[in-house]
Regions:
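Catalytic lumenal/periplasmic loop and adjoining terminal transmembrane helix
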Residues: 28-117, 190-196, 208-211, 227, ...
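C-terminal region of N-terminal signal peptides and the immediate post-cleavage residues
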Residues: 4-33
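Aromatic/acidic, Gly/Pro-rich catalytic loop(s) in extracytoplasmic/lumenal soluble domains
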Residues: 94-274
Length: 274
């Protein structure tokens, strides 16, 4: 039997086993009514779709059996998934964990306070909420200790970008740069781009629902001079290696044609890495 089929069968079997043993998790807020079950399934589907589209392909993802099944259904490769067993004492070994109600119950507040402080996205509300969390190297304490210095570095890089005569920034983009709210990968790429041509920074954003306030904005819309300028921006991004955006294309907005670009999550906080 093919390896993919074996993995799928394993997920299915362990998912059934997890359901049979759910009573062991006395605090597990498992949905019991048809409406709650439907809501839980919808939250899993939305979270899985977001991960398939927004999370770096190189990242290992921790998930409970049902969530792992939903991720596979969204075409996330089984090789990217690490199933978290009900007996696991901690979520270590993965870079991103899908904090379903079952896993929040299993690890309690330690999930956020010890291991995974950063919320990349969130789906649903109340007890059925699903958070996509980043497991910080060194744990939450180390992560939180680095936040201030990382923001200062992003502010400095933003100031440097704004000082470039080739950069024209909207009020929103200007404010985001000076507040240190822009992803380092965007700062580096836009700095390189501005050395070659004039660019207009329209907006920085992150389309992720429920994203944490400490997560830098990893998307941008960029204007240029005429269609030739936009083509030059696209050509520049295509040629990038280390910092090529995960998604970029030319689109039309109310003010005209722009290039939209976005990096996948999770991204670095500081200019020299995590």
């Amino acid at each position: 039997m093919a390896l993919g089929a074996l993995v799928t069968l394993a997920f299915t079997h362990q998912g059934e086993q997890a359901q049979k043993t759910s009573s062991v998790r006395s605090a597990d807020p498992a949905p019991s009514t048809p409406g709650a079950l439907q809501t839980a399934a919808a939250n899993r589907s939305q979270a899985a779709d977001w991960i398939a589209q927004q999370v770096l392909p190189s990242v290992l993802i921790g998930c409970d059996p049902l969530m792992c099944q939903a991720l596979q259904a969204a075409d996330v490769s089984a090789s990217r998934l690490s199933m978290v067993q009900p007996s696991a004492p901690d979520p270590l070994g993965v870079e991103v964990i899908v904090a379903t109600p079952a896993l929040r119950s299993q690890f309690g507040p330690r999930l956020a306070t010890v291991y995974a402080p950063q919320v990349l996205a969130s789906f649903g509300t109340g007890t059925q909420r699903i958070d996509i969390r980043y497991l910080a190297p060194g744990g939450t304490a180390t992560f939180e200790a680095s936040l201030a210095s990382a923001r200062r570095a992003r502010i400095q890089a933003g100031q440097q970008l704004l000082s470039n005569k080739n950069v024209l920034a909207s009020a929103q983009a200007h404010g985001a740069l000076l507040a240190g709210n822009v992803d380092p990968r965007l700062l580096i790429t836009l700095g390189l781009l501005a050395h070659e041509m004039q660019v207009r920074l329209v907006i920085f954003d992150d389309p992720s629902p429920g994203v944490g306030s400490a997560v830098p904005l990893r998307g941008a819309e960029i204007g240029a001079t005429g269609s030739a300028g936009l083509s030059a921006v696209l050509a520049f991004l295509t040629q990038q290696t280390t910092y090529q955006p995960s998604h970029f294309s030319q689109i039309r907005i109310a003010s005209g044609q722009v290039v939209t670009m976005q990096y996948d999550a999770p991204g670095p906080l500081g200019m020299n890495g995590p």
